[in-house]
């Protein structure tokens, strides 16, 4: 209750909804809070036809909104844009979507195309190249993080994972990947990491990437997937991680690389 009271008083960047990311017109994960996020950040979801999922946890896989997009209630969008909704994810993501769709007689499956993705097998969406990597998270499925490239810059999108598995680090080193931006999970805050990272694991990952020459002195480091487990509100945690040279993300943050 103390955290909630502080947030209600201070508002601003302290108000944190559940994470998802828009890169150009590709959405990574679909938050249960997507409606308010789009209103607050002035995002037009009718322009988004590609969804890429990291895993099937409900704070990332919002099946209800997917169904809305595939139903007649989205007829205005369909008249405006006849493109099929392209969805990328693992088997568990596909199963989660199909389970909900099976209960909705109004869904038009011709409006959706699912692409099964696997670790270390790159795929392209327009000018963006995605390379899925193995995450340490939701251990009953192949949870993923991503290397994302646009031909000019390279992002490590490592949100919702604990310390990266050795096979993921080995792949990064063997492929000689250089990151311009690194975005890391920081759900655990000052606590020890588990299937999420905290600040200790954030520092350790940065050092591993440095030793592998996968980053440069100009690489920017963002901490994302912040939660109440951090033990402090965002502006307090922001000061702490800032001492380590990290930037804490917030709702509506826009990064240009």
For each feature predicted by the language model, list its residue ranges.
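Cap/insert and terminal regions of metallo-dependent hydrolase folds
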Residues: 162-253
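Alpha-helix termini
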Residues: 42-43, 70-81, 103-109, 174-176, ...
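Structural motif
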Residues: 26, 50, 153-157, 181, ...
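Active-site metal-binding motif and surrounding structural segment of the metallo-beta-lactamase
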Residues: 31-86, 177-182
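Core dinuclear metal-dependent hydrolase active-site scaffold
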Residues: 1-43, 114-170, 253-257
